[in-house]
Each structure stands twice: as structure tokens, then as C-alpha cells.
Amino acid sequence: MSSKLTVYQATTSMADSPRDPFQSRSQLPRFLATSVKKPNLKKPSVNSANETKNPKLASLEFQLENLKNDLKRKELEFEREQIELQRKLAEEHEQKNSLQLRLTLVEKQLEEQSTSYQKEIEEVRNEKEATQVKIHELLDAKWKEIAELKTQIEKNDQALSEKNHEVMVSNQALQMKDTNLTNLEKLFADSREQLETKCKELAAAEQQLQELSVHNQQLEESIKQVSSSIELEKINAEQRLQISELEKLKAAQEERIEKLSSNNRNVEILKEEKNDLESKLYRFEEYRDKVATLELENEKIQTELNSWKSLITNELPTPEAVSNKLVFLQNTNANLGERVSSLESQLSNKPANQPLGANEKDAAHITELETKLKELHEQNRRLQRQKSLATQEIDLLRENLKSYDDEEAILSEKNTDMKKLERIEGLVKLVDEYKLKLESMPVSLDVDETSDEVSLQKRRRKNEHKDAGYVTELYRKNQHLLFQVKEKTNIEAFLREQIITLESSIATLRQELAQVTEINSCRVLQHRSNPTLKYERIKAAQLEMLNAENSALKALLEDKKVDCLPIQSFKIAERKALDLKKEVAEREKRIQRLKEIFSVKSLEFREAVFSLFGYKLDFMPNGSVRVTSTYSREDNTAFIFDGESSTMKLVGNPSGPEFERLIRFWCDERKTIPGMLAALTLELLDKND
């Protein structure tokens, strides 16, 4: 069965009359569905007796006919598949031939490119070797220069202290030289004007000389003709005198020109010396700033040392006092331990009249209370340690602030911000207040604890026989103390948080002050990424290359024998080629990105069309669009719309022969391709149902 490939012009009119569009949907042409022939269900004409006798034979004949029909249908399908495979083979063969041709062309191009690249690589290798040799030589020279510079730097560092005095003297000399320079510049300008006038006079004198020489030649010629030699000798003598005077004038002018040129050189030397002295002055100022900062740091360290020394001398003036204090603390600790042991023994030696259960309960309760007391004491010790550390940190920060303020007052006397300083002082006062509150808190705690202990001891002495009441009283007091400790710890935590916030605000204010002082003291000369500098460098490099090329071309013009171009022109062309390659690479990247974006967007568009209209769109490389229906059971059948030739092709094997009527009615008469596609979808839906 031959495959159909029908082409329809969208604007042509068909000769046949259109069918009625209001007919029933079942009478519309069938598309993309295989018409399966129904098997012949007619039973063979046999006698009724034979039918009754052989029903099995009739059923077998019926099955045989069905099998024959199936076999024919399968043969037809096989033929159709064979034709399609042959067509695909032919297409693949054509594609293979075209690909082979392309491959040969590409191989030739690659061979040419490889040869050119190999030549370029060899040239580059040679250039690289030469450049590496040059680089090694330059590196050796630079290392030697660096060593020499290091020695010079060491010498300069040693001579810096001596040159500080010289700088002061040189400043005065500089001022004198500046005045001399201005005078010399004025003299130079005057002498230049005089020189120009003298040059003009010289040119006029040279013209006169030339005229006189011409006149002399004329006279010499006339001497030959005229016999009176005495008059000619007089004229010659006068001319010789004039020539000698002019030569003397010329020599004097040349001497004056030499003097002025030497003066000009001296002026340039003085300018260079002035620049050197200015750079030395700048370095001297930097060293002076460093000395000031070092002095401030030294003063700070000395104040810290003095404070530590005063503490040691005031509280503990001698090492004997330190040892005595240690012994005293050890004795107090031992006394307290003895007191605790005596109290424990008193508790253990209670009267025997008390029941055992109560004693055990009281002992357990007392142990619990003792553990709680120990925990509280440990917490108190920790808090005291934290407090001491915090006070030390605050003192250090204050000293740093004072040193910073002193530095600021010394360095920038005018640019001090009074508001910020007042704010810092207020914050410091707040910190002092919180510190006083923290110091007052443990004192009140100690007072409460001591008063409670005294009252407890009195009650113990008075009411030793009433241990149960004593324990309850102790428990109540302990609870009260715990509550007080919790309150005090909460207050202390709150105050510590406030201290931390104040310290952070002080740190931020310091940073702001430092930034302000840096901004006031620093001067931005040039940024790192300066586009104007980059442009100027590129421009300078291009100008150098062009000047080199120009000089080489001039040399070529002078030497007419040379046939080849200079290297500079080749370098410029190479640079242009590199720029073009960069542009091409950027454009290729851009095109690739646009292609990727277009593929993503086209996929979205195709999916939208597929979900809305039920047609799959495939964009071909030649610009045409392949349209296949989702409801068709045959994948090969599809429409191909070509925009350039404005044609619509049907590719594949449409099963319905009435498809031409559908195209006549919708495309030729109604001239709507969307209507035809909609009718097709309805027809395929009916068939599938």
C-alpha cells in the first residue's frame, strides 16, 4: 500500500461542490483511523439436516474465514510498514550521504586549521622561549637591584636621624632656592626673548653675508674685466672687515646661547632637588606622627604601672604584710571549720527522748539546707569573681578611652566633636552608678545573713529542747533568704545587661569617632579601580604601538629595497584580531543564551497549545511547523505548514478518503484552517469513543 503525501494550497479553490455542513457528524470524513473490514458473517448454505448433524464444521468454517480476513489485514499492514521502512531507509541514506559530505568538508577545514594552529604554536613556543630567557635575565637583574635597594634602605634608615637636621636646613635653603628659581626663570624668559631677537639678527646677518658673497663673486668677475685693481682691493678689504665683524657677533651670540642653556639645566636640577626635599619632608612628618603615637602608648603603660605599684604599696607595702595576711586568712578559715564541726557534733548529740523518725527527718532536712547554703555561697563567690572581672574590664576601657581622647586632643585640636564626648562622659557616669549599686547589693545580703545567723544562734541557745520548732524556723528563714537571693540575682542580671548595652554603645561611639578622625586625617589620592586611568593606559599603549609602526613604515619608505611589512603592523593587526575574537565569543555566548531562552519559552508555548487545543507543535530546522493531533492513533500522519511558500502538507497515511471534502469545505470555501482543525478533533474524538 503506497504512502500518501498530499499538498494543498491554502488559497486555491476546488472544482467539486462543497458538502452540506449541517449534515450529521457521523457522515463527516474519517481521518487518521484504520478502517477494519468486518468479517463476512454469512453462514454457508447447507441443508438443515447437515446443520443439525455438523454444527462443529460450521463453526470451524466461520473461524477459518475470520482467520483469512485477519491474515489479509495483517498482510496489508505489513506491506504498509515495509513501504514506510523503505522510505525511512532512503531518507536515512540521503542524510548519511549529506553527513559524509559535511564530514569531508569539516575534515579538510580541520586539517587546514590544525596546520595553521601548529605553525602558530611553533611561533608562540619560540617566542615563549625567548621571553622566558628575557624574563630570567630581568629577574636576575631585578633581584640584584632589590638587594642593592635593601642595602640602600638600611643605609637610609641609619642616616634618617642625621638627615632630620639637614631637612630643617634644607627647608630654609629651599625657600632661598625658590626665590632664586623665580629670579632665574624671569632671567631665562628675558634671555629667551633676547635670544630670539639675536637669532633674528643672526638670520638677517647671514642673509647679508649671502648677499655680500654673491656681490663678491660678481665683483671678482668684474675684476677680470676691469683693470683698476686698487679700487677692487679696497672694496675687498671693506667686505672682509664686515665679514670678520659679523663672525665675532655670531661667536658672541653662540657663547650667550650656551650660557643660557646651562642656566636652563641648572633650573631643572634645582626643580628635581626641590621634589626630593618635599618627599623627605613628607617622610619626616610621618615619622613625627609615629613618635607621637609611641609616646602616648608609653605614657599609658607607665600610668598602668604606677597604678599597680600604688595598689601594692598602699594595701600591702611589703612581702611580710602579704604573708601575714595569708596566715590570717588561713587561721580564720580553720576557725570557721572548727565551728562547723562543733555545730555538727551538737546536732548529733541531741536528747534521746526525741523519736528516731523525727531525728532522721530533721537531719535530712538540715543536710538539704546545708547543701543549699553551700550552693548559695558558691553562687555568691562566682558572682563576686564576675563582678571583679567586669570592674577590671571597665577600668581598662576607661583608660583606653582617656588615652584615645588624649591622642585626639593632641592630633586634631580643632576637629573634636563635643557632643559625642559629652555623651561618652554621661555613659561613663551611668556605668559608675550601676557599679555602686552592684557594690551595695552584697553588703545588704551579708547584713541580712549575719542578722539571721545571730537570731538563729540565740534561738538555738534558748530553745535547744524544742528542735522541731527550731528546724521549721530555720527552714522558713532559709526560704526567705533564697527568695531574697533570687531577687538580688535578678536585679544583678538586669544591671549587668544594662552595663553590657552601655559598653557596646561606648564601643560603637568610639568606632564612629575613629572613622571621623580617619576621614578628617586621610586624603584620597586615587581609587584602585579607576576607569579613567585604565582608559589612559590603553590609549597610551595604542599610541606607542602606532608610533612604533609609523617609525617602522618611515624606515621602509626610506629603504625602498625592503619588500616585507614591519613587525609593529603585524602586532597591531594581531591585537585587532584578538579584539574581534573576543567580540565574536561574547556574541556567540549571547546567541547561545538567547537560544536557550527561546527553547524554554517555545517549550512552554508548545505545552500550552498542546493542553488547550490538543495539537503538538514541532518546529523544523527549515522554518516549517509540524502539527500532530493528540487523538490520532497513527504517529506518522501530520500536517506540515510552511510559511515561506504558504503551503500545507499532509504527511502519512490518512485512512479516510473523504478528507479532501473536509479541506474543500473549511480551507477553500470558508478559508479557516482553525475550523478545519477543530472539525478534525471532533471527528477523531467520535472515532476514539
Curated annotation (Swiss-Prot):
Its main location: nucleus. The keyword Secreted does not apply. GO terms for biological process: attachment of mitotic spindle microtubules to kinetochore; cell division; microtubule plus-end directed mitotic chromosome migration; mitotic spindle assembly checkpoint signaling. It comes from the Eukaryota. One of its GO terms (cellular component) is mitotic spindle. Keywords: Cell cycle, Cell division, Coiled coil, Mitosis, Nucleus. It is found in: Nucleus. Residues 50-423, 486-601 form a coiled coil. This is Spindle assembly checkpoint component mad1. Belongs to the MAD1 family. It comes from Schizosaccharomyces pombe (strain 972 / ATCC 24843) (Fission yeast). Residues 1-15 have a biased composition (Polar residues). Residues 1-54 are annotated as: Disordered. Central component of the spindle assembly checkpoint. Has a role in the correct positioning of the septum. Required for anchoring mad2 to the nuclear periphery. InterPro entries: Mad1. One of its GO terms (molecular function) is kinetochore adaptor activity.
